[in-house]
Structure formats: C-alpha cells, structure tokens
Amino acid sequence: MKFLTIIGLLLCGLLTSAQDNWVAPESAKEVVNVYSENDIATQKGAKMYQKLCWTCHGKTGQGNGPAGSGLKPKPRNFSLGEVQDQSDGELFWKLSNGKGMMIPYKHSLNEDQRWQLINFIRTFKK
C-alpha cells in the first residue's frame, strides 16, 4: 500500500511541475496583436476579465482570487516577468488552448475578444 501511495505522490508532483513549465510553441512568438496599445480594446478586455478571470487570478491579477486559493498549481500572477516577458502571441496561444485547470477559450471567445483580454493582462505589468 505504501508503494502505491508513493507512486501516486510522485505522479501528482510530475503533473504539477509539468503545469509550471507551460511553454507555447515557437510559432506563437511571432503572432502579432492587432489591438496592441488600443485603449478601447483594453477597456473591453477589462470587462471580460471581470467576468471570466478575476475569481482565479484576482482583481489585480496576482493569482490570488477566491476560487484560485485551492488550485494546484496556483493561478498565474500576471504582474510577474514570467508572464509579462512573454510575447502577446505566446499569451494568446495559452489563453486559446488552456492547460490543466486553465480552460481553453478558443471556443468561447472569438479572436478579437482574446486579444482584448491580452491587452488588459498587460496592464498588470509592474
């Protein structure tokens, strides 16, 4: 029984570390945000964030939302360099495809809405 418990814990650890090393494909880096620095798009993104994202990622994007407290791994802190240093295309790919507890939005948000959300996520940069 101890053996199965140890194997289970190891597998959980591997899954958690796989979530932490989330890398978009190289091709995503080159995708350009057509709404970059568009204030109206950013405002629309803010409204979507309040509807879809804040419960896990928090009102200030620090990964401390009420629904995210019990998640493993924790939701991303959007103000950190590990997020902000990625290209818009990489963030768009991750938002579109999801992973683990992060659901894919490519079926529920159109491309314009996803770019608008990326614009708003950029406002969390320290």
Residue ranges and their predicted role:
Residues L9-S17:
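Hydrophobic h-region of N-terminal signal peptides that target proteins for export
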Residues M1-L9:
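Sec-dependent signal peptide recognition
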Residues D39-Q62, S96-N97:
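Sequence/structural segment immediately N-terminal to covalent heme-attachment motifs in c-type
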Residues K51, R76, G100:
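Glycine-centered loop/turn positions within well-structured domains
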